[in-house]
From Swiss-Prot:
Top-level taxonomy: Bacteria, Bacillati, Bacillota, Bacilli, Lactobacillales
GO CC, any one term: cytosolic small ribosomal subunit
Any Pfam family hit: Ribosomal_S2
Organism expressing this protein natively: Lactobacillus gasseri (strain ATCC 33323 / DSM 20243 / BCRC 14619 / CIP 102991 / JCM 1131 / KCTC 3163 / NCIMB 11718 / NCTC 13722 / AM63)
Gene coding for it: rpsB
Key words, A-Z: Ribonucleoprotein, Ribosomal protein
Membrane-traversing stretches: none
Entry's Gene Ontology molecular function annotations: structural constituent of ribosome
Family membership: Belongs to the universal ribosomal protein uS2 family.
Superkingdom of origin organism: Bacteria
Comp. bias (Acidic residues): 245-254
Name of the featured protein: Small ribosomal subunit protein uS2
Length: 261
């Protein structure tokens, strides 16, 4: 069973690539044809590769993986935030701050500052400070929230990064490559697919296309996490059963001892 149907892909415009003069030759294997100066992506390959991406993401989620969704272009901002949040994961949908991954310790210090400012605003500290100082602190808090709010609670460097438009997010992709973090990405006809570990050939400019693919990745995480929960339940049940059997064995021994007495 496919993750999405051909009809869904067509309706979302996933097949529309870039103008033929703006292309990366390495994407040739994923191009079906060209029409009116626009490359048309081979959706048969998109379906197959999206299924592969779905299964990969689901497997990582089932092992308790942490995911970071990245998409800072205007068309991607809402979908990236909403789908990452729906899956209980993390996101960057504003400007990528250089070193977000490769200088994680520094980023964590800024996240700590964000949490401190939030606490100050909630516990009444701002109420007793001069208005000018409060204005400066509020501005600082809003800026940090804008850039770091999506990773504020991320416990560690992600196990997988999902990217909308890796050409635009080349710094994020490069940092992931340096750290060996697998990258799953929507790759359009104007983008070099080589830095991407799991390629999903797709229009990365249309809002509906971004929403569809991002949603599929969120669904994969949710399904994987459900599988993890089920596995944990089974393990707990088996552990409880083993403990109960041990208790029974002890009870039998006690009975034998009593009978000998």
């Amino acid at each position: 069973m496919t993750v999405v149907t051909m009809k869904q892909l067509l309706e979302a415009g996933v097949h529309f690539g870039h103008q033929t003069r703006r292309w990366d030759p390495k994407m040739a294997p994923y191009i079906f044809t060209q029409r009116n100066g626009i490359y048309i992506i081979d959706l048969q390959k998109t379906i197959r590769m999206l299924d592969d991406a779905y299964n990969y993401v689901k497997a990582v989620a089932q092992d308790g993986g942490v995911f970071l969704f990245v998409g800072t272009k205007k068309q991607a901002q809402d979908a990236v935030k909403e789908e990452a949040t729906r899956a209980g994961q993390y996101y960057v949908n504003q400007r990528w701050l250089g070193g977000t991954l490769t200088n994680w310790t520094t980023i964590q210090s800024r996240v700590k500052r964000l949490k401190q400012l939030k606490e100050m605003s909630e516990d009444g500290t701002f109420d007793v400070l001069p208005k000018k100082e409060v204005a400066l602190l509020t501005k600082e808090m809003e800026k940090l929230e804008r850039f770091l709010g999506g990773i504020e609670d991320m416990p560690r460097i992600p196990d997988v990064m999902f990217v909308v438009d890796p050409k635009k997010e080349k710094i994020a992709v490069h940092e992931a490559n340096i750290l060996g973090i697998p990258v799953v990405a929507m790759v359009d006809t104007n983008t070099d697919p080589d830095p991407i570990d799991v390629v999903i050939p797709a229009n990365d400019d249309a809002i509906r296309a971004i929403r569809l693919i991002s949603g599929a990745m969120a669904d994969a995480i949710i399904e994987g996490k459900q599988g993890q929960d089920d596995s944990e339940d089974v393990e707990k049940e088996m552990a409880d059963k083993a403990a109960a059997e041990n208790d029974d064995e002890e009870s039998i021994e006690e009975v034998v001892e009593k009978s000998e007495d």
